[in-house]
Amino acid sequence: MTTVPVKAPIEELPTIHAVTNDELLLRPGFLRKAMGIMSVLGDKGAIHIRSQLLDSPTLYGLTLALLELNEQTKCWCIVNDRVDIALACGAQGVQLTHKSIAVPDVQAIAPALRIGASVHSPDEARDAEQAGADWCVAGHVFETPSHPGVPRRESSFINDVVAAVSFPVIAIGGIRPEHVRSLVHRGAHGVAAIRGIWNDENPELAASRYLSQV
């Protein structure tokens, strides 16, 4: 009889999520910077490996390299969208978007894999929780270059999402260190950032600024 893996109870979800993109992943010295950020954040942090352009072998190799750093730092590695890469590499989780395969389908393929869902409204957050996701990343909260022309929702958006669900909510979108404490007071479990960490002259120091506000 085949034994089906069972998802372990989720330990404390990291509070600071350093999200990447293709431009960041292809920068010279990316792994060196990632090591510094992961060392600062430790088990309170997660690196999100998010790519739309890298071929599968490259993304697989990069994810494995980051998971080697996870062994030293305990900082999580979460793969965006690519369930196959997350499962093959043994990542701590996968982050799904509205373009990804559905949460129940991921659970059928990989019952032990932790699942996050990217949402843009309280209703989407509620649907994600009911589908079986372990957390949601909700945004965007403030103006961000990745969504030009889209009005900011402000911190009250997080109040509405938190009120709709019982699982952890991670706020994303134009979030700077000085926003973190207010968002946590509004019920967010933590925050996600891209430019605020990776584009800083000292990414390690930037990561520590975010962490100090939780």
Pin down the residues of each PLM region.
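Conserved N-terminal beta1-alpha1 strand-loop-helix module at the mouth
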Residues: 1-134, 150-153, 160, 166-167, ...
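C-terminal binding/interaction regions
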Residues: 186
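Short acidic/polar capping segments at secondary-structure boundaries
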Residues: 142-143, 175-177
